[in-house]
Design a protein with these regions (language model features):
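N-terminal hydrophobic/helix-forming segments and targeting peptides
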Residues: 1-172
């Protein structure tokens, strides 16, 4: 833990995690006569779409969209007309405990479709996408089409649907 005493030695390599979402790692130089340091950072969470809680939107009893929110600056067009899936963390009740399970649905599950040109004549004229209207993914579950989104997650994790308490899921 960050708050515990660390025995730092020349040439040592160390890491710590925060909230099971971040890792901070560093290596100590072998010569400590120069007390300078370099910092390198990166993140892999942006841009993306975060799946909202109670995400299913049934449209005219014909198809299902997932309610998402855009995260980070993105080029919307790069998300269109390609197979997408979901990964992240799911909180599950196990007995008297709440456990975090990692989820990666490693198959095509979603798509954010472009609409036909006759339905959007401005598509080639600098069309401005509305993330809450134009960029909601369609659930294209294939063999899972009779299941709701939460059941797909439960099946993937091998848990009961009613034991899922929450999630932190993202499209990729």
């Amino acid at each position: 833990l960050e708050s515990e005493h660390w025995d730092i030695v020349p040439g040592g390599k160390y890491y710590v995690t925060r909230n099971n979402t971040s890792i901070l790692a560093f290596k100590v130089g072998t010569k400590l006569d120069n007390y300078s340091f370099n910092i390198v950072t990166s993140h892999t969470d942006s841009p993306t779409f975060k799946v909202k809680e109670n995400a299913e939107i049934e449209v005219k009893n014909k198809y299902t969209q997932l309610n998402t929110e855009g995260y980070g600056g993105m080029l919307c067009a790069t998300w269109l007309d390609r197979p997408l899936s979901i990964a992240g963390r799911v909180l599950v009740s196990e007995g008297n405990s709440i456990v975090t399970k990692l989820l990666n649905i490693d198959r095509d599950l979603l798509m954010i479709p472009n609409v036909a040109i006759h339905m959007n004549r401005a598509a080639n004229d600098g069309f401005k996408y509305n993330l809450q209207v134009d960029m909601l993914p369609l659930l294209s579950a294939g063999d899972d089409r009779q299941k709701d989104f939460k059941q797909i997650i439960a099946d993937e994790l091998g848990v009961k649907k009613e034991d899922i308490l929450g999630h932190d899921l993202y499209l990729y």
